[in-house]
Swiss-Prot record:
It catalyses: Endonucleolytic cleavage of RNA, removing 5'-extranucleotides from tRNA precursor. The lineage of its organism: Archaea, Methanobacteriati, Methanobacteriota, Archaeoglobi, Archaeoglobales. PANTHER family: RNA-FREE RIBONUCLEASE P, UPF0278 PROTEIN TK1425. This is RNA-free ribonuclease P. CDD domains: PIN_VapC-like. Its EC number is 3.1.26.5. GO terms for biological process: tRNA 5'-leader removal. It is an enzyme of class 3 (hydrolase). Belongs to the HARP family. NCBIfam families: PRK04358.1-4, RNA_lig_partner. RNA-free RNase P that catalyzes the removal of the 5'-leader sequence from pre-tRNA to produce the mature 5'-terminus. It holds the Pfam family PIN_5. One of its GO terms (molecular function) is ribonuclease P activity.
Length: 227
């Protein structure tokens, strides 16, 4: 059966992928991953999709911020299939929707309790300090700490953006695998019965497929990369 994969932004930009493969920069890792995707398309008929315009816009904006060459954007437009998920036809089981609502509700309650704790802590700080600049310094540090904890509580394990949801909808529509390093996407991919591939493992998986083909041009390409 022909293999298809739907990529989110982290499939190209994941920091863990760069460390694991030894890439020096985001632009270098993006170029190499896109080259692998191109070879997989030409030699193995493996297609990699990206939800359009949501994830595509997110990814291109990310690459532009890092000053990547125009060649990378050309590769992206050539080898990633841009497709908008059919949001009106893709069917999601009611049990999944029900579970998601419960998860969000639980996180809202945890976020509220966390906010209450920090409000009480800030009140204690202002009560014992008189110097305005010192109060601002202490409260500023407390707010920064609260933001980090609140983000961890609210975002971990849920779909917190439209692009995240588009990845799952498109994968469901195409019966494709999902490539990402996002914990929320992973969790709900598993709930939907979708194949999930860690972003950091995706390049090596493609290399293994290609090496088993035994084509001289493919083997030579890998040898030149290692040199």
């Amino acid at each position: 059966m022909r293999q298809r994969f739907v990529l989110d932004t982290t499939a190209i930009t994941d920091a863990g992928l760069r460390i694991k493969e030894g890439y020096e920069s985001l632009c270098e890792s993006a170029a190499e991953v896109l080259d692998l995707i191109a070879l997989a398309r030409l030699k193995l008929d493996i297609s990699c999709y990206i939800p359009y315009p949501s994830v595509y816009t997110e990814l291109t904006s990310f690459l532009k911020r890092y000053g990547c060459d125009e060649e990378i954007f050309t590769k992206l437009d050539t080898w990633l299939v841009k497709k908008t998920p059919n949001r009106y036809e893709v069917k999601i089981p009611a049990a999944i929707f029900y579970e998601y609502i419960i998860t969000v509700r639980q996180k809202m309650n945890r976020g509220r309790r966390l906010a209450e704790e920090y409000i009480l802590e800030s009140s204690a700080i202002t009560a014992k300090l008189e110097d305005k600049s010192k109060i601002e310094e202490e409260i500023g540090a407390l707010i920064s700490k609260f933001r980090d904890k609140y983000r961890a509580v609210m975002r971990q394990g849920i779909l917190d953006s439209a692009p995240d949801l588009d990845v799952l909808l498109l994968a469901k529509e195409l019966e494709a695998g999902v490539v990402s390093s996002d914990a929320g996407i992973r969790k709900w991919s598993e709930r939907l019965g979708l194949r999930f591939v860690e972003a950091a493992k995706f390049p090596r998986m493609l290399k293994e497929y290609l090496k088993l083909m035994g084509s001289k041009d493919i083997v030579g390409w890998f040898e030149s990369e290692e040199d």
